[in-house]
Design a protein with these regions (language model features):
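N-terminal Rossmann-like dinucleotide-binding module
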Residues: 1-35
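A contiguous active-site-proximal alpha/beta segment in oxidoreductase catalytic domains
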Residues: 46-51, 88-148
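Hydrophobic residues in well-ordered beta-strands that form the structural core
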Residues: 82-84, 108-110, 236
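NAD(P)-dependent dehydrogenases' Rossmann-like dinucleotide-binding region
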Residues: 111-115, 127-149, 160, 164-168, ...
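Contiguous beta-strand/loop segments that form the cofactor/metal-binding neighborhood of enzyme cores
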Residues: 163-241, 268-280
């Protein structure tokens, strides 16, 4: 992710520094970007540098060290922080740090970049044109046969729903509103690295949108969101694309829209960074992320 952020920051003509840990990774980073990172990690950097009140940090470390780095950065007085999702290795770790971060939550933002996909912005425009969203269905199936063999830090795969699937869940309820009256179901599967593998649920959101979801990590499937208005069904599947089924027809056709920025950069990242630097209120702040984790993600599990 650090390489993707550098590409965006360079394109936006921003002045920035990069903090790395090891010599080998720093040398590789310099070879790829032409930028020499500060070596030694965040602790060493903060020991030798004083942060200005308007200093902005982007934390793009491995999932397992997101929270420790965040604690160091806010303790040192960072003015604003964008931290990669989901800001902690587990929901438990996030909630354990709630009190420590509570008074700082309005300046910490979680990088759910799919909110800024060109496809999502286009879908929002279409929903508004049609008079609003009526119902929604989403799926966050993960390919367990691919994820299982991956070598990850302890705790990452065990919390894969939180670390990865919440990309879909966050976006779904960002578009439809927060669930209010709803039920969720989940069950164990045969994989040994994640407690639950089969999920379903349904209900209504605070904006009156009916919703349902399903996910079976040991069957076929993929990420996707279906958005139903009075005039059409909008498909975000894949989520970078957009397809439409018009009311009274059975054909599902690709919808053309301007997504060049998501071809030039990692999808959603350019607009996300732009928002972080200029209009952070459009991002998910840490306080809301904590609430979602407690009230939605834990219930889905």
């Amino acid at each position: 992710m650090a390489l993707d952020y550098v590409k965006v920051l360079n394109a936006q003509k921003k002045t920035f520094s990069v903090i790395g840990r090891g010599e080998a990774s720093a040398a590789k980073f310099k070879e790829q970007t032409g930028i020499a990172p500060y070596v030694g990690g965040i602790n060493k950097y903060l020991e030798n540098n004083t942060l200005q009140p308007d200093t902005k940090f982007i934390i793009a470390t491995g999932t397992e060290v997101l929270m420790p780095v965040l604690r160091e950065v806010v303790a040192a007085g960072a003015g604003r922080v964008l931290i990669e999702k989901p800001a902690a290795v587990s929901i438990a770790e996030l909630l354990e740090n709630e009190q420590y971060l509570k008074n700082l939550a309005d300046k910490i933002f979680v990088a759910y970049n799919r909110r800024f996909y060109s496809s999502v912005i286009e879908a929002q425009k279409m929903i508004k044109e049609d008079g609003g969203l009526q119902s929604m269905h989403f799926e966050f199936t993960e390919w367990a046969h691919i994820i299982g063999p991956l070598e990850k830090a302890p705790g990452v795969k065990e919390n894969w729903f939180f670390a990865n699937s919440t990309h879909v869940v966050d976006l779904a309820f960002y578009l439809a509103g927060s669930p209010t009256d709803w039920r969720s179901f989940s069950k164990h599967g045969t994989i040994d690295w994640h407690e639950k593998t089969n999920f379903a649920g349904a209900g209504i959101t605070d904006t009156g949108v009916l919703f349902s979801y399903i996910s079976n990590w040991e069957s076929a499937g993929r990420w996707g969101i279906e958005l139903l208005t009075a005039k059409r069904r909008i498909y975000l599947r894949p989520m970078e694309g957009l397809s439409v089924q018009v009311k009274g027809t059975v054909a599902v056709n690709e919808h053309e829209f301007d997504n060049q920025i998501d071809k030039d950069f990692k999808p959603g990242l350019y607009k996300q960074v732009e928002a972080f630097l200029t209009q952070p209120e459009s991002l998910l702040n840490l306080s809301d992320h904590i609430d979602k984790s407690r009230e939605i993600y834990q219930k889905m599990l």
